[in-house]
């Protein structure tokens, strides 16, 4: 019986080691992801709404819980933002998504991939907008428009 118990213990420790659950860094992993998520939130919360004099945080378009960070590998992270427009027919939801993307691409200090979505069920055309704000070519084309670029620049400008 003792032999079986020892074999079981060895097998379990081996499985945990192979799965990465017993690595010293594994316990730090959730804390690191939380820290990265807070870092992301700190950057996006001060983005100004294109129509109103408020920030996205003040309007509750973004919150700490709308940011998720996952590790892709040791040097790169997947950042997922799910924002909530103020009304289901918000005509500027695409512009808000563009502002989020531009600010994070410019300011995030770590290597990342970025996915930005409208929170499910919060906008009448969320699928179309999600496609637009995650399409690199459409984002690049939008930023080539001088009028649109100026609006984005005003929204992402850091407050004094």
From Swiss-Prot:
Broad class of the protein's primary localization: cytoplasm
Q: Which GO terms describe its molecular function?
A: metal ion binding
Binding positions (Zn(2+) 2): 89, 123, 150, 153
List where in the cell it is found: Cytoplasm
Top-level lineage group: Eukaryota
Q: Where does Zn(2+) 1 bind?
A: 89, 123, 150, 153
Q: Name one Pfam family in it.
A: FeS_assembly_P
Q: Which UniProt keywords apply?
A: Chromosome partition, Cytoplasm, Metal-binding, Zinc
PANTHER family in UniProt? CYTOSOLIC IRON-SULFUR ASSEMBLY COMPONENT 2A, CYTOSOLIC IRON-SULFUR ASSEMBLY COMPONENT 2B-RELATED
The record's subunit annotation is: Monomer and homodimer. Component of the CIA complex. Interacts with CIAO1. Interacts with IREB2. Interacts with APAF1.
What is the protein name for this chain?
Answer: Cytosolic iron-sulfur assembly component 2A
The organism encoding this protein is Homo sapiens
Q: What is the lineage of its organism?
A: Eukaryota, Metazoa, Chordata, Craniata, Vertebrata
């Amino acid at each position: 019986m003792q032999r079986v118990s020892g074999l079981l213990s060895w097998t379990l420790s081996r499985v945990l080691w192979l799965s990465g659950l017993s690595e010293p860094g594994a316990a730090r992993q959730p804390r690191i992801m939380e820290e990265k998520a807070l870092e992301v939130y700190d950057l996006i919360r001060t983005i100004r709404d294109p129509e109103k004099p408020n920030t996205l945080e003040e309007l509750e378009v973004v919150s700490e819980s709308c940011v998720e960070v996952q590790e892709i590998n040791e040097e790169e992270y997947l950042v997922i933002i799910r924002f909530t427009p103020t009304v289901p027919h918000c005509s500027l939801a695409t512009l808000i998504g563009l502002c989020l993307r531009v600010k994070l691409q410019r300011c995030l200090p770590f290597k990342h991939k970025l996915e930005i979505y409208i929170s499910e069920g919060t906008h009448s055309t969320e699928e179309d907008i999600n496609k637009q704000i995650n399409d690199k070519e459409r984002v690049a084309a939008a930023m080539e428009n001088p009028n649109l670029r100026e609006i984005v620049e005003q929204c992402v400008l850091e407050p004094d």
